[in-house]
From Swiss-Prot:
GO cellular component: endoplasmic reticulum membrane; membrane
Entry keywords, A to Z: Endoplasmic reticulum, Heme, Iron, Membrane, Metal-binding, Monooxygenase, Oxidoreductase, Transmembrane, Transmembrane helix
Keyword Transmembrane applies: yes
This protein's name: Isoflavone 2'-hydroxylase
UniProt-listed Enzyme Commission number(s): 1.14.14.89
Taxonomic source organism: Medicago truncatula (Barrel medic)
Organism domain of life: Eukaryota
Membrane-topology descriptor: Single-pass membrane protein
pH-activity note: Optimum pH is 8.0.
Residues given in the record as heme binding sites: C436
Length: 498
């Protein structure tokens, strides 16, 4: 009875506090962006129907391109137009270079010390320097080209097993995820986790890590109400904080194991971990174990799911538009032919394929809300005052479908990128100081895979119906239904893989 009374009194006083806070918000924060009326304690959380990018777009159509919402006690501003986005990351770029402090940053991203979770400052500049020089420089990306070539060719061989004489049905979704995971893991540690030549224990280890990532994404952003409502953090009926902490502990065991395994080897190789461990010997203050594990985690989170879903969406579009498939195939055959396989050096010539990828990124942006930003100081957005410590979300999905920015905004039209200036409107990788540093690596891997798939196989849909392009809700926008298709090998497969 005592505990019940305590909870009742706590709820009562917290309710009074939030009601008073709500009444004084309009006085404290003048000239905020418009938005729907918020409720005590929960703010606008009751407005957040899934998926969020579509909900925000609907609210934008009612209140304007810059809107404000209260996620519990935290103010959130959502930007949904290209002009305001560009204002944010030119004039206000430094002000918006911080990240919000969520539970995931504390327990999973090493107490806000990873590249994606840390706020702007000396530590971030150090991480960015390490990433630019030691992880994602052109030299390092070129060094890993044989890995990308090998993984894509393994995919081709696997698909060709049943399709050498006739069309065969193949499942592509999980193959893309396995391939991109192998790509990044081989860059990081030299290990393959999926394939016929892999040890079952390593497959289980990778599956456990993927499950951790899946649970992490489910508990990120608006899904974790304790990040926005102090009362829930205090009560924590759903054990959300404990769950996030447990994920962080499991994640650290996995990454620490990778470092220990590389350290135990007699000879260092060309992997990312080995290179960073070599740097640790001469500059231990910059290349700590925590920083190395954080960089590995950033590569795995940013370089696997996003690339895999982009491959899936792009192949779905290619299959839904036979004329697009024909143009891509003709381009590959013209510049490469059927006597050898596509190489990364051929990619600059495949401009129509590039357009197809960008058009897919436009309509099916892998991270529809990008990564959240936080204001380091008060600033002006779209003529409105935005206070310090406001969470800022960019609805890239809505911006990419804005009819004021794009002609035939919802139509799949790759040739639009032949027009000068269109590519500058793309924001799938962000903009400014906190733009994604892995854009070059991602586009190389995606382009290489798609070029080989079109060069090596004839493709068609399983039936006459178009592939369902519905999306699943989540931080990463995946297809609702896994992608399946029919393929049959072309002559180059027999010539190269005798």
């Amino acid at each position: 009875m005592g505990i019940l009374s305590y909870l009742c009194y706590s709820l009562f006083y917290l309710s009074i506090f939030f009601i008073i806070r709500l009444l004084f918000q309009s006085r404290k924060f003048k000239n905020l962006p418009p938005g729907p009326t918020s409720l005590p304690i929960i703010g606008n959380l009751h407005h957040l129907k899934r998926p969020l990018n579509r909900t925000f777009k609907a609210l934008t159509e009612k209140y304007g391109n810059v809107i404000s919402l209260w996620f519990g006690s935290r103010l959130v501003v959502v930007v949904s137009s290209l002009s305001e986005f560009q204002e944010c990351f030119t004039k206000n770029d430094v002000v918006l270079a911080n990240r919000p402090r969520f539970l995931s940053g504390k327990y999973i991203f090493y107490n806000y010390t990873t590249l994606g979770s840390t706020s702007y400052g000396e530590h971030w500049r150090n991480l960015r320097r390490i990433t630019s020089l030691d992880v994602l420089s052109n030299h390092r990306i070129n060094n890993f080209a044989p890995i990308r070539r090998d993984e894509t060719q393994r995919l081709i061989k696997k698909l060709a097993e049943d399709s050498s004489t006739k069309f065969a049905e193949v499942e592509l979704t999980f193959r893309f995820f396995d391939m991109t995971f192998n790509n990044i893991m081989r860059m990081i540690s030299g290990k393959r986790y999926y394939g016929d030549d892999c040890d079952i224990s390593e497959v289980q280890e990778a599956s456990q890590f993927r499950d951790m990532v899946s649970e992490l994404l489910q508990l990120s952003g608006a899904n974790n109400k304790t990040d926005f409502m102090p009362l829930l953090k205090f009560l924590d009926f759903e054990n959300l904080e404990k769950r996030v902490k447990r994920i962080g502990e499991k994640n650290d065991v996995f990454l620490s194991g990778l470092l220990q395994e590389q350290r135990s080897k007699k000879e260092r190789t060309n992997t990312m971990i080995d290179h960073l461990l070599n740097m640790q010997e001469s500059q231990p203050e910059y290349y700590t174990d925590t920083i190395i594990k954080g960089l590995c985690l950033a590569m795995l989170l940013a370089g696997t799911d996003s690339s895999a879903v982009t491959l899936e969406w792009t192949m779905s579009n290619i299959l839904n538009y036979p004329e697009v498939l024909k143009k891509v195939r003709d381009e590959v055959d013209t510049h490469v032919g059927q006597d050898r396989l596509v190489d990364e050096s051929d990619l600059p010539k495949l401009t129509y394929l590039r357009n197809v990828i960008y058009e897919t990124l436009r309509l099916y942006t892998p991270a529809p809300l990008l990564l959240p930003h936080s204001t380091a100081d008060e600033c002006i957005m779209g003529g409105y005052k935005v206070p310090r410590d406001t969470i800022v979300l960019i609805n890239a999905w809505a911006i990419h479908r804005d009819p004021e920015t794009w002609s035939e905004a919802t139509t799949f039209k790759p040739e639009r990128f032949d027009k000068k200036g269109e590519l500058e409107k793309m924001i799938a990788f962000g903009m400014g100081r906190r733009a994604c540093p892995g854009e070059g690596l991602a586009l190389r891997a995606i382009s290489m895979t798609l070029a080989l798939l079109v060069q090596c196989f004839d493709w068609k849909r399983i039936n006459d119906e178009k592939i369902d392009m519905s999306e699943r809700d989540g931080f990463t926008m995946t297809k609702l239904l896994p992608l399946k298709a029919m393929c049959k090998t072309r002559p180059v497969v027999n010539k190269v893989f005798k």
